[in-house]
């Protein structure tokens, strides 16, 4: 499966993509697979697997394997470092945290991880990763110089730099469990400069209203993760979010 082409096809046909983020450190591999299956029943298009801390090694491998046993949508690694790679996934967001002060998150982890991606033939999807206030755990771990919420022009120039460096996707991240999502003004400003390049938005998207607001502002893909760990009916919550963004 060519994952990037698959996601593009969904955008062409349905307008937007919904991605479910599962952190292997938050539950057992078996429970992760149950969440993934419930999300797929709700209409999610792919499963992202990763987290800021603890998502590596045997736990990561077992989580990917269990999820793939349950669902047939793409599994995409969302690594916090080079340790967050698994040869069992379909693809990886091969990303650079452009607004990190730590070169490790800008390029060193990528250099260390590239051989495994090459050898295992996981599909790399190039991505500029940008962390916006409040940033959450990922902002702290990644030593990010957070982009202020009220400075959409800063996010836009970072995104433009990523585009000119050849990155296909840009991800605006407010941080897992953020109290509110990226504001529409910033999403719109970034999408304007990206043009046909794809914009992912995540963090703080907890209901249909927030999802629709982000999608309408210009997000091509919406990510939800934390809220799915908190609700009893994952299928219903995902269906609510998906129906808000798809045409």
Swiss-Prot record:
GO terms for cellular component: cytoplasm. It is found in: Cytoplasm. The keyword Transmembrane helix does not apply. Its main location: cytoplasm. Sn-glycerol 1-phosphate binds at residues 171-177, 203-204, 225-226. It catalyses: sn-glycerol 1-phosphate + (2E,6E,10E)-geranylgeranyl diphosphate = sn-3-O-(geranylgeranyl)glycerol 1-phosphate + diphosphate. Pathway: Membrane lipid metabolism; glycerophospholipid metabolism. Keywords: Cytoplasm, Lipid biosynthesis, Lipid metabolism, Magnesium, Metal-binding, Phospholipid biosynthesis, Phospholipid metabolism, Transferase. Transmembrane segments: none annotated. GO terms for molecular function: imidazoleglycerol-phosphate synthase activity; magnesium ion binding; phosphoglycerol geranylgeranyltransferase activity. Its cofactor is Mg(2+). GO terms for biological process: glycerophospholipid biosynthetic process. Mg(2+) binds at residues 23, 52. It is an enzyme of class 2 (transferase). It comes from the Archaea. Gene3D superfamilies: FMN-linked oxidoreductases. Its EC number is 2.5.1.41. Prenyltransferase that catalyzes the transfer of the geranylgeranyl moiety of geranylgeranyl diphosphate (GGPP) to the C3 hydroxyl of sn-glycerol-1-phosphate (G1P). This reaction is the first ether-bond-formation step in the biosynthesis of archaeal membrane lipids. Belongs to the GGGP/HepGP synthase family. Group II subfamily. This is Geranylgeranylglyceryl phosphate synthase. It comes from Methanosarcina barkeri (strain Fusaro / DSM 804). The lineage of its organism: Archaea, Methanobacteriati, Methanobacteriota, Stenosarchaea group, Methanomicrobia.
């Amino acid at each position: 499966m060519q994952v990037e082409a698959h996601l593009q096809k969904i955008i062409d046909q349905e307008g937007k993509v919904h991605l479910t983020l599962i952190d292997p450190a938050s539950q057992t591999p078996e429970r992760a697979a149950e969440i993934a299956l419930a999300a797929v029943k709700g209409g999610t298009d792919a499963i992202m697997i990763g987290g800021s801390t603890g998502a590596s090694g045997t736990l990561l491998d077992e989580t990917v394997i269990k999820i793939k046993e349950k669902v047939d949508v793409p599994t995409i690694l969302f690594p916090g470092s080079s340790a967050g790679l698994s040869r069992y996934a379909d693809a990886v967001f091969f990303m650079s945290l452009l607004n990190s002060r730590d070169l490790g998150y800008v390029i060193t982890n990528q250099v260390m991880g590239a051989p495994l991606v090459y050898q295992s033939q996981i599909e790399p999807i190039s991505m500029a990763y940008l962390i916006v206030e409040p940033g959450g755990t990922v902002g702290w771990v990644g030593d990010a110089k957070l982009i202020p919420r009220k400075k959409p022009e800063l996010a836009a120039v970072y995104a433009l730099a990523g585009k000119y460096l050849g990155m296909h996707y840009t991800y605006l991240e407010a941080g897992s469990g953020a109290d509110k999502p990226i504001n529409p003004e910033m999403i719109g400003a970034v999408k304007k400069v990206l043009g046909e390049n794809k914009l992912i938005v995540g963090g703080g998207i907890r209901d249909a209203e927030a999802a629709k607001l982000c999608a309408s502002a210009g997000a091509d893909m919406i990510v939800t993760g934390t809220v799915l760990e908190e609700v009893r009916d994952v299928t219903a919550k995902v269906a609510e979010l998906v129906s808000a963004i798809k045409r």
